[in-house]
Amino acid sequence: MARITVEDCLKQIPNRFELALAATYRARQLAQGHTPKIESRDKPTVVALREIAAGQVGVEMLKKVPV
């Protein structure tokens, strides 16, 4: 099993706080049934981090959050 680390994700989103918000929002989307952008059997939080590390998802997720 490949491990995902925060350092891998920080290469894509340098701000830890934005990273946490983007990962949280994406994980919630995945938990609600949205289609993952990568192939994985992991839990939504891990899939969200893997998507961020792969560059499939970024800070644009924060622009979709309703205020």
Curated annotation (Swiss-Prot):
GO molecular function: DNA binding; DNA-directed RNA polymerase activity
Pfam family, any one: RNA_pol_Rpb6
Highest rank taxon of the organism: Bacteria
Catalytic activity annotation: RNA(n) + a ribonucleoside 5'-triphosphate = RNA(n+1) + diphosphate
InterPro entries per the UniProt record, alphabetical: DNA-dir_RNA_pol_omega (IPR003716), Pol_omega/Rpo6/RPB6 (IPR006110), RPB6/omega-like_sf (IPR036161)
Gene Ontology biological-process entries: DNA-templated transcription
Keyword Nucleotidyltransferase attached: yes
Enzyme Commission identifier(s): 2.7.7.6
Any single Gene Ontology cellular-component annotation: DNA-directed RNA polymerase complex
Enzyme class: transferase
Keywords: DNA-directed RNA polymerase, Nucleotidyltransferase, Transcription, Transferase
Family stated for the protein in its record: Belongs to the RNA polymerase subunit omega family.
NCBIfam families per record: rpoZ (TIGR00690)
Protein function: Promotes RNA polymerase assembly. Latches the N- and C-terminal regions of the beta' subunit thereby facilitating its interaction with the beta and alpha subunits.
Subunit (UniProt): The RNAP catalytic core consists of 2 alpha, 1 beta, 1 beta' and 1 omega subunit. When a sigma factor is associated with the core the holoenzyme is formed, which can initiate transcription.
HAMAP family: RNApol_bact_RpoZ
Name used for this protein in its record: DNA-directed RNA polymerase subunit omega
